[in-house]
Structure formats: C-alpha cells, structure tokens
C-alpha cells in the first residue's frame, strides 16, 4: 500500500468527524501511524504542507493555477486520492483556528524540538515554492511566511537563506545563501557548506519524510549552495 493510499484512508477517517480541526488531525497522525516512525514522518510532512498551504491561501485571499501547479511539483497526487487531499485542504481552510495555531501544532508534530529543525525548514521552503509560483510573493504571503519561520524557531540567518533562493533581490549575497556571517574563517565556511550539502543529500531528504518530487526542487537549493560557496572561495582566493 502506497503512502497516498494510507494518507487517503487517514484523511477519510479525520474528515468523517463533523468537528474536525487541527487538534484532531495532529492527534490522528500521532496515533494512527505510531507503530511506523518512517511512515509517520512522511505523512506528517504531507499533512503539514497541505494544511499550511491552505492557511497561506486563506491569508492571501486567492489561489492561482500557478500555485496549484507548484503544489503538484511537490506532491504527485494519484487521481484516486485527489478528493481526499482536497478534503484535508478544506478542513484546514475552513477551520476557525488561525494559522499560528496550525503552525504551532505542525511544529510539535514534525519538529525535533530544537531551533532550525531541517524538516521544518523543508516545509517552509515548500511554502515559499508555492507562494512564488505566480511570479511574486505578495505582502500577506511574506508576512505569513516570516511568522511561520518564527513559530518554527527558524532563526533570521536561516530564514534569509531560504528567502534568498526564492526572491530575486538582485545579486544574491553568497554568505546569506549559506546562512553564515561574512568574515568567518574559511574553515568555518567550508564546514557550513559541507553540512548543507550533506543535509540536502537525497537519502537524507527521504529519511526526513520528503516525497520523491520534492527532491527535484531540492536540486535548485543545492545548486544555489554550490554557487554561493564557489563565489566565496574565488573571492577569498583573490583577496
């Protein structure tokens, strides 16, 4: 049985309750998949992305076809499960609980309990990918994403690194892309670079619960990291 079959069964169970909300969704993920940690992580990532995408759309007030396509780049949903994914999306969008409560619950569900948790950074990265799909991150979307980062305990340097990959602010600052302060010794820069490359290896991404489709998006992340490191290395070599 694929993850989408399991996720479809789960969503059908949650949506059958008339009072379904974030508390029901989170508790169901914890209990239904408690015996399979790997599957639980994959379901948790999918649920967080779907629910927070819905909340972002509600905050922005509009969903464009470009954003729908961007979502489909992260998740290749089988036609048989499209209805169930739409159910979860609707639960989140119609729930009176605000997006901050959703973000807090998703952080508890997906996070490690530490600042700059990689899985939560992946979720934020995915939300940026969707938000920028229509060519512009609107003001409300930007405010939403920054607040999500705060709730996820993603510090400003890591947030700026994610932002720099999605928003064209002119020539990207390579130090911002790597999330490291300018002026640090080259050994620290190289150590940071190697950690980023290791964290973004496909095996690591899958282990964190990311779907196969997300790995294609992560290649853009790795390309930006490589380019930033090469730029710093060249600059220091000619200094």
Please give the residue ranges for each predicted region.
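Small-residue-enriched hydrophobic alpha-helices in membranes
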Residues: 1-55, 65-239
């Amino acid at each position: 049985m694929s993850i989408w079959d399991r996720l479809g069964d789960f969503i059908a169970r949650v949506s059958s309750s008339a009072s379904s909300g974030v508390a029901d969704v989170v508790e169901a993920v914890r209990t239904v998949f408690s015996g399979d940690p790997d599957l639980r992580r994959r379901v948790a990532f999918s649920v967080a992305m779907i629910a927070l995408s819905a909340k972002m759309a509600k905050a922005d007030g509009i969903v464009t076809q470009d954003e729908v396509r961007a979502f489909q780049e992260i998740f290749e949903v089988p036609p048989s499960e499209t209805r169930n994914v739409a159910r979860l999306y609707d639960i989140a969008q119609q729930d009176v609980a605000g997006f901050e409560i959703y973000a807090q619950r998703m952080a508890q569900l997906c996070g490690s309990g530490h600042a700059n948790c990689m899985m939560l950074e992946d979720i934020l990265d995915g939300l940026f990918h969707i938000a920028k799909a229509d060519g512009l991150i609107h003001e409300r979307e930007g405010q939403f994403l920054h607040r999500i980062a705060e709730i996820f305990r993603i510090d400003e340097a890591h947030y700026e690194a994610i932002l720099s990959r999605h928003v064209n602010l002119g020539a990207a600052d390579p130090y911002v892309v790597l999330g490291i302060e300018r002026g640090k010794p080259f050994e620290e820069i190289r150590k940071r670079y190697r950690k980023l490359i290791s964290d973004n290896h496909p095996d690591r991404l899958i282990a964190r619960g990311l779907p196969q489709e997300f790995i294609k998006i992560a290649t853009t992340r790795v390309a930006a990291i490589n380019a930033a490191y090469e730029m710093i290395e060249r600059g220091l070599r000619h200094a």
